[in-house]
Structure formats: structure tokens, C-alpha cells
């Protein structure tokens, strides 16, 4: 990464790059849409420009997405945030379903589940998500994904279910033209810039517990890089309860121009695991084990706050939490997850 000028703005506050796909793409089959995205015939969505995630392989019923394990994806422990795997897996899982769809079919993600199989790696190299279709009956699609780190280590396993809509009449759509030219930017895309301050791996005693979360809410402690990348802030802290806020920014949008399920999942996972962090004893660690997110409504990029409230519902060595995600007063997602304490 080349040295770049420092900007006072957080990445999500800057003018957005990328954008939704040309509606003419719906004239193409899902597989052809994926090829157009891979080959640059469709412009990359904003969340891909933010994180560096990209489509690299298309199989008969499978896809592979990669994403740089950038320092910008580090969480409060200094390693890659587990929510980054949720963000990446959402792209791969929906892409796998898309491989078998005819022209004009839209779909929405109903549910995404992720199991984390190991402690997250330090920044460096690439994260890889390989997803394939398990089932598609024309009304529902089910896909499965495995996520690996730079050295091939297995980091996570995910599944997703989508609802398929009846095909639209695409005969009136224009033919797909070239994507709009990209403006000239003074800085590289956010994920490729130096991250200041750099993430550091810190001892559990310095990273867990209610007091540290309270310091984050008060602005006493620097926010981790991934929070600065997407705009997440801790707004309220209590023992076993945590509230995060994230702006419905254009930077978080997918190919359809809506805030992506992966970004909502990142926020939900953050609140779910932080509820466990608030219960951790001084000097002990914590590790997210899994998260399941049910998506209830789409979120437009209107700049309004997306609120995630995580609440511990069971405390022991294994902490279970639930999270409600709202936008403009509407419930848009619910999540449950477990966190092991003392690791």
C-alpha cells in the first residue's frame, strides 16, 4: 500500500465510490450478471469499493469472493472482526444462488447464519469465501459457504436462505451499456489506505469488560478500525446490554442500491458479541462462536441511524445474546448469537 494523505473524514463520510448496477442487467441471467460484475461490465457496488471484496471465480453452481484482510477490518481485539466474515459471506452466499437464476428474478435474503471456527487472524493477506447452492425450488434458495484465511485456515461456515420473486418482464429494459466512468480520486479506495492509528493486538485485560465499553461510548478509547470504516459507534452501555449506531450510508450499499445484508449483519454481530464482552471478568477473554440473523426489511441509504441493541439472555461460560436492529423506528433484523467467556 502506498503512502496516502491523511484525511480528517472517516471513510464512510467521504463522497461515495461505486454504486448500484444498471437496471438493464436484469435482462441477463444471474450467471451472466455475475460474469459482467467480475469482468467490470457492471460497476462495483459501494460496499465493495469500501472493503475491497470482489468476485474472483464463477462455477456452475458456486462462486468465490475474496476480500483483503485489511487493517481496516480489525476489531477491538486487534484481529479481524468476526463481523467481517458475515459481510463477506453475504456476498458469496447470494452470488451462489444467483448462478442458477433466469433473467428478471429478484430475491431478498431472509436469513444468514455463521459459525466461527477459530480465533480471527491478524490483518494481512486475503479472506476467501467459497459458496455453493444446496437447494433452489424457484421460490426459495439455500446456499452454504466456507470461509478461509490467508494461510488456508478454516475460519467460518455459513448458510443463507433467500426468497425468490416471480420473474419480471424485462423486454422493455434497454440493453446493457458500459458502466459510467470512474472519477479521478486523490486517495485509493478506503480499504487500501494506511490505517491510523494502526490496530494492535492487546491483552484481554485491556480489551474486555463493561468499563472498556463505557470508555468507548464516552470517546475516551479510540474506536477500532472497522467501526471507523463503516461509522459504527457505541451509544449506550450497561451490564449485559449494549447499543450501537451505524449510519445508513451509501457506502454500505449493494448492487441494488440498498444497505447490504452483510453490513447489517456486521452491526448485529457487533452488538451480540459486545453484550458478552460487557460480562467478561477483568483479565479474561471472550470469543464469538456464532450468529444467526433474520432480515425483516430492506434499509435505504437515507443517512439515518441504524440502531442495534444487544441483550444477554443467558450468562455462564457460554453467553447467549439477542439483538434487535431498527431503522427509522422499524424493526429490520433480529439476531441471536453465542460468545464463550474466559478465552
Predicted feature locations:
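Terminal targeting signals and extreme-terminal segments of soluble enzymes
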Residues: 1-343
Amino acid at each position: 500500500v502506498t503512502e496516502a494523505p491523511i484525511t480528517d473524514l472517516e471513510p464512510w463520510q467521504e463522497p461515495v465510490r461505486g454504486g448500484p448496477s444498471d437496471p438493464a442487467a436484469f435482462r441477463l441471467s444471474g450467471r451472466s450478471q455475475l460474469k459482467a460484475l467480475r469482468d467490470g461490465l457492471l460497476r462495483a457496488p459501494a460496499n465493495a469499493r469500501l472493503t475491497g471484496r470482489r468476485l474472483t471465480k464463477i462455477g456452475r453452481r458456486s462462486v468465490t469472493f475474496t476480500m483483503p484482510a485489511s487493517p481496516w477490518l480489525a476489531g477491538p481485539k486487534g484481529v479481524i472482526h468476526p463481523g467481517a466474515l458475515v459481510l463477506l459471506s453475504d456476498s458469496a452466499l447470494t452470488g451462489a444462488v444467483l448462478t442458477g437464476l433466469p433473467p428478471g428474478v429478484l430475491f431478498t435474503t431472509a436469513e444468514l447464519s455463521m459459525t466461527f471456527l477459530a480465533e480471527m487472524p491478524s490483518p494481512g493477506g486475503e479472506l476467501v469465501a467459497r459458496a455453493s447452492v444446496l437447494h433452489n425450488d424457484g421460490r426459495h434458495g439455500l446456499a452454504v459457504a466456507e470461509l478461509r484465511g490467508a494461510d488456508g485456515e478454516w475460519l467460518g461456515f455459513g448458510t443463507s436462505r433467500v426468497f425468490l420473486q416471480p420473474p419480471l418482464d424485462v423486454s422493455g429494459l434497454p440493453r446493457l451499456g458500459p458502466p459510467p466512468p470512474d472519477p479521478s480520486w486523490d486517495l485509493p479506495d478506503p480499504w487500501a489506505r494506511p490505517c491510523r492509528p494502526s490496530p494492535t493486538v492487546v491483552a484481554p485485560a485491556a480489551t474486555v469488560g463493561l468499563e472498556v465499553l463505557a470508555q468507548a461510548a464516552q470517546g475516551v478509547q479510540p474506536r477500532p478500525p472497522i467501526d471507523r470504516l463503516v461509522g459504527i459507534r457505541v451509544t449506550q452501555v450497561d451490564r449485559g446490554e449494549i447499543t450501537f449506531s451505524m449510519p445508513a450510508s451509501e457506502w454500505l450499499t449493494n448492487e441494488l442500491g440498498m444497505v447490504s445484508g452483510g453490513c447489517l449483519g456486521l452491526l448485529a454481530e457487533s452488538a451480540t458479541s459486545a453484550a458478552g464482552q460487557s460480562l467478561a471478568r477483568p483479565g479474561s477473554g471472550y470469543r464469538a462462536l456464532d450468529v444467526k440473523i433474520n432480515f425483516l426489511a430492506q434499509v435505504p441509504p437515507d443517512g439515518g441511524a441504524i440502531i442495534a441493541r444487544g441483550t444477554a439472555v443467558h450468562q455462564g461460560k457460554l453467553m447467549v445474546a439477542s439483538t434487535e436492529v431498527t431503522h427509522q423506528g422499524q424493526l429490520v433484523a433480529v439476531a441471536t448469537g453465542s460468545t464463550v467467556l474466559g478465552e
